[in-house]
Amino acid sequence: MELRARGWWLLCAAAALVACTRGDPASKSRSCSEVRQIYGAKGFSLSDVPQAEISGEHLRICPQGYTCCTSEMEENLANHSRMELETALHDSSRALQATLATQLHGIDDHFQRLLNDSERTLQDAFPGAFGDLYTQNTRAFRDLYAELRLYYRGANLHLEETLAEFWARLLERLFKQLHPQLLLPDDYLDCLGKQAEALRPFGDAPRELRLRATRAFVAARSFVQGLGVASDVVRKVAQVPLAPECSRAVMKLVYCAHCRGVPGARPCPDYCRNVLKGCLANQADLDAEWRNLLDSMVLITDKFWGPSGAEYVIGSVHMWLAEAINALQDNKDTLTAKVIQGCGNPKVNPHGSGPEEKRRRAKLALQEKSSTGTLEKLVSEAKAQLRDIQDYWISLPGTLCSEKMAMSPASDDRCWNGISKGRYLPEVMGDGLANQINNPEVEVDITKPDMTIRQQIMQLKIMTNRLRGAYGGNDVDFQDASDDGSGSGSGGGCPDDACGRRVSKKSSSSRTPLIHALPGLSEQEGQKTSAATRPEPHYFFLLFLFTLVLAAARPRWR
């Protein structure tokens, strides 16, 4: 009888063990068919993809509950999620660069066309208006326009000195042409040059051109240069690689729901923002100087209008040149007398002809040209675009979450919070590197800013200072603002209020969300939801039953 009782004990214990091992119908592993379909659609082999959920102790990024992912699948999806984010960043960068390039080319082409039209008018009208005074000096005029183009394009020229040298050379050549009967050696011409400022042989034209051209050209080229620097900054920042911590966080954001067997769960909005704010923390630090640059560019467009504005002045250079030659011819006799008085009587040239009595006058209409409205339209479009992209760097995480990360439309019990389907409770971090010290999703070392981005912040500062100088009409030294080495090492320290803080740590208390049961959620699904954070209870029950079996069998072993 005692043996029969022991047998029943053993039989019951064995049945209990089998039942616990197989589980009740509600706790059977879910199918991975949907995950297999999505995984295969991304070009991966399905040979090692499980048909149903398996234990997830092997996972290194995703929660280690029941899973549809093997280690290889997790690694493949992690690499794929990183490439998807990199592609999204590059696409956004290219779109912004294209916007800036469109504005740059439109306005740059317009200013260059104005200068080309001015030179073409000069070439067409001056031969008939001034004869040999122009045709024998075409190279001097051609060189002037060439240097104006170089200056506009950002060459390191001093415009006032360039214009002064042009007028000095032109005065020497024209004075000799107007007095072919005189011998004018170099020392005599040097004396002429020294008296030129007091004699004002070209009237007010040189001074007017200098004052207006300096302000007009520096305003035009600083605006175009600003567009170029902005585009170059965007291009270089797009080349900054994602940190390994970011790659892990993005995998968890995008594909751990698939591994968890809930591929339909889309990332919670605040969860997505925290991940990308951590990933793009350095990029957000561009915001302040980026805004300063765009504000300065909008402001400098005020210098494009009116009689001293860039549009009128650049397109009217030939008119001041014509006015200058007219003044020289008008004042020829008075000028000659004053030069002889100051420099002495020059010798007569025995081979020279007599003074040309027939004075040729320009027939150019010197009235102000009416605006075609082209520049107004281009500038209006550019200013609107610049205002639209002012918050580009700090809005980038939200934009990517909305457009590229298939973010859930609302933060509710049905979105993916990084562990399961449920609400995401941590607060959203601020913008920039210093604000990521407590980011619950991405481990960010706020004491180590990205040096490439710090260099680009310095480039924005340099360009902004040039624009502000240009607004005041100053002839700014336009060395290449896109030089990779410029500003190297500058701005590399952490912000004053953040120095001394250490790398951010993920707080389990702030990270673990509360899990709310969904309507119709089975007991099996509820258990699997929390599998990553607590042990399965039936393991304790198995241990208890196994102890009973040993106790029942002990007398038999004696």
Swiss-Prot record:
Cross-referenced PROSITE patterns: GLYPICAN
Subcellular location as annotated: Cell membrane; Endosome
Membrane topology (UniProt): Lipid-anchor; GPI-anchor
Chain spans, region Disordered: 478-531
Family membership: Belongs to the glypican family.
Lipidation (GPI-anchor amidated serine): 530
Cellular component terms (Gene Ontology): cell surface; endosome; extracellular matrix; extracellular region; membrane raft; neuronal cell body; plasma membrane; side of membrane
Pfam families: Glypican
Tissue/organ expression: Nervous system.
Gene Ontology annotations of biological process type: cell migration; heparan sulfate proteoglycan catabolic process; myelin assembly; negative regulation of fibroblast growth factor receptor signaling pathway; positive regulation of skeletal muscle cell differentiation; regulation of protein localization to membrane; Schwann cell differentiation
UniProt cross-references to InterPro entries, sorted A to Z: Glypican (IPR001863), Glypican_CS (IPR019803)
Origin: domain of life: Eukaryota
Disulphide bridges, residue numbers: 32-68, 62-256, 69-259, 191-343, 246-279, 268-415, 272-401
Name by which UniProt lists this protein: Glypican-1
Keywords, in A-Z order: Cell membrane, Copper, Disulfide bond, Endosome, Glycoprotein, GPI-anchor, Heparan sulfate, Lipoprotein, Membrane, Proteoglycan, Secreted, Signal, Zinc
Signal sequence segment: 1-23
Propeptide stretches in the record: 531-558
GO molecular function: collagen V binding; copper ion binding; fibroblast growth factor binding; laminin binding
UniProt PTM comment: S-nitrosylated in a Cu(2+)-dependent manner. Nitric acid (NO) is released from the nitrosylated cysteines by ascorbate or by some other reducing agent, in a Cu(2+) or Zn(2+) dependent manner. This free nitric oxide is then capable of cleaving the heparan sulfate side chains. N- and O-glycosylated. N-glycosylation is mainly of the complex type containing sialic acid. O-glycosylated with heparan sulfate. The heparan sulfate chains can be cleaved either by the action of heparanase or, degraded by a deaminative process that uses nitric oxide (NO) released from the S-nitrosylated cysteines. This process is triggered by ascorbate, or by some other reducing agent, in a Cu(2+)- or Zn(2+) dependent manner. Cu(2+) ions are provided by ceruloproteins such as APP, PRNP or CP which associate with GCP1 in intracellular compartments or lipid rafts.
Glycosylation site residues: 79, 116, 486, 488, 490
Role: Cell surface proteoglycan that bears heparan sulfate. May act as a catalyst in increasing the rate of conversion of prion protein PRPN(C) to PRNP(Sc) via associating (via the heparan sulfate side chains) with both forms of PRPN, targeting them to lipid rafts and facilitating their interaction. Required for proper skeletal muscle differentiation by sequestering FGF2 in lipid rafts preventing its binding to receptors (FGFRs) and inhibiting the FGF-mediated signaling. Binds Cu(2+) or Zn(2+) ions.
Gene that this sequence comes from: Gpc1
